[in-house]
């Protein structure tokens, strides 16, 4: 009877410790989420302004004409930040990611403590999960940065009264099939829609845009491409689309 009571007390202590650990994990993941959201918002705001003014400068330099431009309105910046372009605001995605991570961490801790798993094995499993959490965080930030950069550039086209833009995909073998299809397609600025005809079209999207002022303006422009074998970059004509590049530099060379 005494041994059974001692075992019961030990089991009860283990459960109490487990619940405390699970609560600590949840609280810390949410604290991390708050930090990520606050830092990301500042980063995104700075990137919006930088993309807007840099693109205005590039447009004027390309045209060879300097003219006064308006400051980017605060309400436009807020609109870009608040836009649920992918169906869910980035802050909600951060909270979702940390919810998933917290649950996975709790499962590792629960199964480890209840089964008597070694601390080294548990530490390894926890490390793998936090590495994945870091990857998910980086993927979200990279994708959102692509969105706000391209959204800010659209605003710069409006400021310059440019009514069309051209979709620019990356010329290498990592480019997604959807971005390959959109490469060098021309769209109306007023109908730009992130995830549809404006990058990003998917997570880790590397596509961008440039002002479209007619085909003749592309004659003197070069595009960068990456050699599939060496990884080195080289220049191709600005009017060359992804399909043409693939046929000439991948299929024919292969």
Regions found by a protein language model. Give the residues of each.
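Hydrophobic/aromatic-lined pockets within catalytic cores
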Residues: 26, 30-37, 49, 110-114, ...
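Acidic, glycine-rich two-metal-ion catalytic cores of nucleic acid-processing enzymes
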Residues: 128-228
